[in-house]
Amino acid sequence: MKRTYLSLIAAGVMSLSVSAWSLDGVLVPESGILVSVGQDVDSVNDYASALGTIPAGVTNYVGIVNLDGLNSDADAGAGRNNIAELANAYPTSALVVGVSMNGEVDAVASGRYNANIDTLLNTLAGYDRPVYLRWAYEVDGPWNGHSPSGIVTSFQYVHDRIIALGHQAKISLVWQVASYCPTPGGQLDQWWPGSEYVDWVGLSYFAPQDCNWDRVNEAAQFARSKGKPLFLNESTPQRYQVADLTYSADPAKGTNRQSKTSQQLWDEWFAPYFQFMSDNSDIVKGFTYINADWDSQWRWAAPYNEGYWGDSRVQANALIKSNWQQEIAKGQYINHSETLFETLGYGSTGGGDNGGGDNGGTNPPEPCNEEFGYRYVSDSTIEVFHKNNGWSAEWNYVCLNGLCLQGEIKNGEYVKQFDAQLGSTYGIEFKVADGESQFITDKSVTFENKQCGSTGTPGGGDNGSGGDNGGDNGSGGDNGSGGGTDPSQCSADFGYNYRSDTEIEVFHKDLGWSASWNYICLDDYCVPGDKSGDSYNRSFNATLGSDYKITFKVEDSASQFITEKNITFVNTSCAQ
């Protein structure tokens, strides 16, 4: 349903008088600005790892014609899109999803892809978290080949399908303009579907200085005139190289690059960027920063056939990173927290890892003499590590209370930082591939203010108190169990049950293991299984008809039992 919040608008640029008005839309925070990052899976992961934080929002893309990027990898040279992977990696973050018309907006408007629209909406709603749907993003961008009639008709249809499918409290519809300087002003109305069909107005913020901020200011005023919140859906310091500290005024080929100091770069692009949000604080409620090495992605790389973009990674320069962390730590920004979904107006707060937003910068930790343990980063951040003992390591996971993320190799160690609470007890675990086998170790630790937490009790890595608080049953995690066929009634030892077209339950019968820990995995996304009757089971978001690898692993005294298989998700129970 629509939510209306009172806001204040300045009566003039220098005036102190104000008038009350309202912002109308779905999933609009009462106060604050949602911080999200994009725009490909690996760039999001690199940002989260480099800054030691869980983003409040994560951004990715899908094509409507083939739904490429929805449930598997799709890369058109601009980085990997895989919404399923991103949603599973960040179960307690909002999703910001751009939907490309693939140049066929009129065919979309004619109804040719209505089945795909339903699949898309049902899949996104199945993740049970706030979803900001950027339908036909950059509606007026000439490179997209959109028609005003196709935009208007398709927007109205998608809005009505969201309601018809019962997803109106989960999916917010964003109408995003390109804010492209070469585009003449005064043309936005022809693309507008109507206020009743739009929740947010979005814009792109790349090089607004090229036209004295005219296009972004026009978009902001348009949102204000419609009483809609404003989302900076795509923003990046175009033509700047953060790592190399250069700038080019040439948008086509990036020629004649000028050297910049890190402070100059910040002052020229980042400071005006945040000032734009401050100047429009009555309507700005969210932004997505594209944190990517554009030059490393072949679509954007030399010879720059689609323009020169640069390198926007904030972690590529110490001052830029520090300034960024200090800025978004301010009170007006909405970072990741256990109340994030509630803050965004979602129906429940969800579960999973309890973030506290950006943890700020830290000095590189000193290597420890012990093989496996933790080190204190801050009162709310723990770093779990294991020394690299030369495994083949096709994959590795570092875990805190069952939340397992891929570790980074730093200073001869696999490391990963997590949100944590000083004084709490946690289960930490490390697992890594080693040829045809794997190495797994875990212990229980109490998080204290010291660099190398060596005191730990061996045992189940998922038995601590804290960290992942009920992520299996919350709105941000996987879907829990319940309903459908009881796995104990199945003749198969290991398989899956159909729960719905978007939910699969993986199970394995209990064969009498000691089982101080167990994990059930879907495509290498591993979480502790629930013991129900004589079976271990776990539900995941999935898409009917798709292929998956399912895995079960369990501790058995001093050893472990592991089994896996490839399956196609069909509408059946007790599938082997």
From Swiss-Prot:
Residues 347-360, 456-485 have a biased composition (Gly residues). Optimum temperature is 37 degrees Celsius. Inactive above 60 degrees Celsius. Completely inhibited by Hg(2+), partially inhibited by Mn(2+), Cu(2+) and Pb(2+). Unaffected by Ca(2+), Mg(2+) and EDTA. PROSITE patterns: GH26. One of its GO terms (molecular function) is xylan endo-1,3-beta-xylosidase activity. It is an enzyme of class 3 (hydrolase). Residues 347-367, 450-486 are annotated as: Disordered. It comes from the Bacteria. Residues 363-453 are annotated as: Carbohydrate binding module (CBM) 1. Belongs to the glycosyl hydrolase 26 family. The carbohydrate binding modules (CBM) bind to insoluble beta-1,3-xylan, but not to insoluble beta-1,4-xylan, beta-1,4-glucan, beta-1,4-mannan, curdlan, chitin, or soluble polysaccharides. This is Beta-1,3-xylanase XYL4. It comes from Vibrio sp. The gene is xyl4.
